[in-house]
Amino acid sequence: MQNHGVKKNKILAVGSVALDTVKTPFGKADEALGGSATFFSASARFFSPVSVVAVVGEDFPKKHLALMKRLGVDTANVSVEKGRTFRWSGEYNFDLNSAKTLKTELNVFATFKPVIRPENRASKVVFLANIDPDIQQSVLKQVHKPSFSACDTMNYWIGSKKQSLWRC
């Protein structure tokens, strides 16, 4: 992809890199690479460089981080902590537009407190992937006036932190 001399700004994506178990009428995937920050960065990389800030557990397969790196995603700010990786389990019916959450296990994600490194604080585009809305707000306070920020959430946070979501 040519950029015709246009300087591309790095996108900062902060949030979930996970292991997902997904069941559809067409099959099931167990502990597949998942998470909002993962899916966002895999897509956004076609348009601009992406740096991911996330936490995974010591059980997170190294092949998943290797895949993200091969896609050109900066994973230098993905920390590996003692404990289990965030897991989500869901089910889709024939209408693949909506999922039913079967289980959410926060694990190391429950204590995730992202610190944005100086080289990422000037990011003009910030994607707040599926994380606690209070943490999303703390990330916004660490970056210097992004031109655009977007917030992803899910039923887990909508049910437990609705008031915090309104402040994002």
Positions of PLM-derived features:
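Short, basic, low-complexity termini and linkers enriched in Ser/Thr/Gly/Pro
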Residues: M1-G5
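Conserved N-terminal subdomain of the carbohydrate kinase-like
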Residues: K8-N9, L19-E31, F46-F127, L140-K145
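Active-site metal-binding loops of divalent metal-dependent hydrolases
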Residues: G15-V17
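Short, acidic/turn-prone active-site loops that include or flank metal/cofactor-
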Residues: S36-T38, V80-K82, T153-W157
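Proline/glycine-anchored alpha-helix kink/cap motifs
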Residues: T38-R45
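Conserved beta-alpha-beta core of the PfkB/ribokinase-like small-molecule kinase fold
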Residues: K124-C168
